[in-house]
C-alpha cells in the first residue's frame, strides 16, 4: 500500500488558536466535565446517557438533533446527564468507502483531513454554543484527540475492542 503526503497538519495548539473554543463555552465544558466526574465517582445519583447516531456527517442535521436533545435534557436533568454522541469517524474493514467527516467533511468532495478536523471543531463548538451540551465522540485515531480535547469528551477504541 502506497502513501502520499499531501500536506502537513498544523500543530494542535496552532489549530486551536485559529479555531478557538470561546471562554464562555470552555466554562460550560469545565462545568459539565466536573458533573460527569461527580457521577462516575458516585457523588451524584444521576446517570450519564450518551446518545446519538452512528454517523455525524452533516453539521446542520447534527445541530438540529442536539437542539432537540437539549429540550429532552431540560426535562430529565434532575435524574440524567445527557451527552450527545457526535460520531465523526466511520470504521471500514477494507479501508474503502466513506470514512466520515474527519476524513471527508463533504462526501461529494475528495478527502481532506485538515478540512475535516476544522469541520469537526466548528460543529462541536456550534453544538455547545446552541445547546450548552458538550459532546462525546469516538476516536478511531487517538492522535487526532489533541486537536479536539478542549472541546469534547472522547473514548478511544478500536473495532478489535468492540468484538471482545
Predicted features along the sequence, with ranges:
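N- or domain-start disorder-to-order transition segments that initiate the globular core
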Residues: 2-43
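Generic N-terminal targeting/processing segments that precede catalytic cores or assembly contacts
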Residues: 28-46, 61-75, 82
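Conserved, mostly hydrophobic/aromatic
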Residues: 52
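Short strand->helix junction
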Residues: 55-56
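A generic, well-ordered mixed alpha/beta core segment in the N-terminal half of proteins
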Residues: 67-146
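Terminal, contiguous helix-loop blocks that mediate binding/assembly
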Residues: 148-150
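Conserved small/polar residues in nucleotide/adenosyl-binding loops
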Residues: 156-163
Amino acid at each position: 500500500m502506497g502513501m502520499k503526503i499531501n500536506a502537513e497538519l498544523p500543530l494542535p495548539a496552532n489549530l486551536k488558536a485559529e479555531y478557538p473554543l470561546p471562554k464562555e463555552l470552555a466554562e460550560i465544558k469545565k462545568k459539565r466535565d466536573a458533573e460527569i466526574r461527580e457521577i462516575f465517582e458516585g457523588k451524584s445519583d444521576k446517570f450519564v446517557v450518551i446518545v446519538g447516531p452512528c454517523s455525524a456527517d452533516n453539521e446542520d442535521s447534527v445541530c438540529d438533533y442536539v437542539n432537540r436533545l437539549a429540550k429532552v435534557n431540560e426535562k430529565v436533568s434532575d435524574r440524567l446527564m445527557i451527552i450527545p454522541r457526535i460520531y465523526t469517524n466511520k470504521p471500514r474493514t477494507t479501508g474503502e468507502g466513506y470514512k466520515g467527516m474527519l476524513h471527508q467533511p463533504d462526501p461529494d468532495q475528495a478527502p481532506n483531513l485538515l478540512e475535516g478536523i476544522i469541520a469537526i471543531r466548528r460543529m462541536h463548538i456550534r453544538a455547545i454554543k446552541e445547546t450548552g451540551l458538550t459532546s462525546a465522540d469516538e476516536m478511531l485515531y487517538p492522535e487526532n484527540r489533541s486537536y479536539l480535547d478542549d472541546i469534547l469528551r472522547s473514548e478511544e477504541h478500536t473495532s478489535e475492542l468492540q468484538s471482545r
